[in-house]
Amino acid sequence: ACEGEEDLMSSIRIRNGRVIDPQHGVDTMRDIGVRDGRIVELHPQEAVGEEIDAAGCVVMAGGIDLHSHIGGGKMNLARMLLPEDHRLNREPIALPTNPLELASCGHCAPGTLATGYRYAEMGYTAAFEPAMLPSNARHAHMEMGDTPILDHGAYVMLGSDELFLQLLAEGKDFQTVRDYVGWTIHASKALGVKVVNPGGISAFKFNQRKLNVDEEHAHWRVTPRTIVQTLAKALHELGVPHPLHIHGSNLG
């Protein structure tokens, strides 16, 4: 094919859609031209390889889900606890009607392929796993890597990490604690840090059934407030763009 034909085949015009672009203050009916995967200006009469009628639809950048459990040990546990979720009415898994899709299954805890397909149908292009254990990071990344279409990343959990709590309990200097946070982010290939019931998950191992914000951990004698403040300061000094992701105290 000649160069002109290749340009034609790689070009798309999205017509009649409501274009929303908050970054540039755009909220109007407008056509969008695409060539080689990039938005370009097309002449209204220019021939294109494909035209999409987006009447009644919103045209905008892909959605980003900052908190979605899509990888790691908790997903496998959910699938084990929901065997009935893998099949509809106990029938074999139906083959997808879309020729671009491979067979997958699940609704409450879907397989990786189904996760990517369902997100794409909703207009999302990125999702982030917010609860990755450092020891489980390799598995979490491999599972997310098997999820099609979606860009992905994860936040590593440190609020009840035993070594982190030990450093606080021993009164180690802040630079040492900060460096441990930075090392954990790097080693686990995380994009940020999350705490879930800070200190409380560890405290439960010592039969401490609740841990309020200013209540001391039964073993390590540190409080959730200290944990949160230390991690927030560490992330700020490390220059991590995403702030500390917090799941509050005594929540399920």
PLM features: what roles do these ranges have?
Residues 1-8:
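Short, Lys/Arg-enriched N-terminal segments with co-localized hydrophobic residues
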Residues 9-12, 19-61, 77:
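Histidine-rich, glycine-flanked metal-binding segment
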Residues 57-143:
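Metal-associated gating/positioning segment near the N- to mid-region
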Residues 62-66, 127-129, 152-156, 191-195, ...:
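Hydrophobic faces of well-ordered beta-strands that scaffold small-molecule active sites
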Residues 89-111, 158-178, 221:
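Active-site mouth loops of central-metabolism enzymes
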Residues 133-180:
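Mid-domain alpha/beta scaffold segments of enzyme catalytic cores
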Residues 172-197, 201-252:
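Histidine/acidic residue-rich metal-binding segments in metalloenzymes
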